[in-house]
Amino acid sequence: MNLEEYKKIVKERYPIDPKNLPYYIVYDDFLFPHEFGTLKSYMSSEFPWGISNKLNYDDQNPYLVKKIYDVENRAREEWTAGVDEMPFIAITSRIGMVAMLRLKANMYLNSQVQDIHYPHIDYQFPHQGALFYLDDCDAPTYMSDGVGIESKPNRLLLFNASTAHSSSAPTNINYRQTININYFGGGIRSEYLRMLKDPTVVSEHVPFTITTHGGR
């Protein structure tokens, strides 16, 4: 679908809840170079991808996916066997989480035309989302207000994952990889931000205060 169709569907199906407002913050150069290199190498070589026949209930496009952590799994089985969780800890350890709900990797294959996927929410209840990008391509993530967050290597998007958003597939590279985290909590840990001389916020829409420990 095009952007106007996307915004129309979001307005009709996902009206804004004053008690659960959308927000987004984008950080570039989020990981240190050696951490990003380790993660990128793992995702591009030995990572055990699976396939899903559809993106969500309303979008039948197939894509590659792998759950790495799921709180709904049985006790002591939340982390998926056969996946090395260590490369992902570099991301999760820098986020002010109270509890993680899900951690998964997505891969969208090349599309012949630019097309926005059907909008969705990750969970029905209020929670936070973090989306980490590994590739430079023409496949943005679209927020509920229609703003497209471009896919750039080592970029982190923090957003309200219980409000409408959508992915898209690239036309200028073979695939687009992202790491999607759903959690209860707040923003980037303050001690990590202090390690960065000038943390680069490239896009921001926050109609309230989001803290490290999850307060608003």
Where are these regions (language model features)?
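A short coil-to-beta-strand element that immediately follows conserved catalytic motifs
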Residues: G96-N106
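A short beta-strand-loop-beta hairpin characteristic of the jelly-roll/cupin
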Residues: Q114-Y118, F125, Y133-K152, L193
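Short beta-strand His + acidic residue motifs that chelate non-heme Fe in jelly-roll/DSBH
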Residues: Y118-P119, A164-N172
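A short hydrophobic beta-strand segment most commonly corresponding to one strand
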Residues: A130-F132, I173-R189
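Conserved metal-binding segment of the jelly-roll/cupin
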Residues: I149-H165
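Short, charged interaction patches at domain edges and termini
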Residues: N182-F208
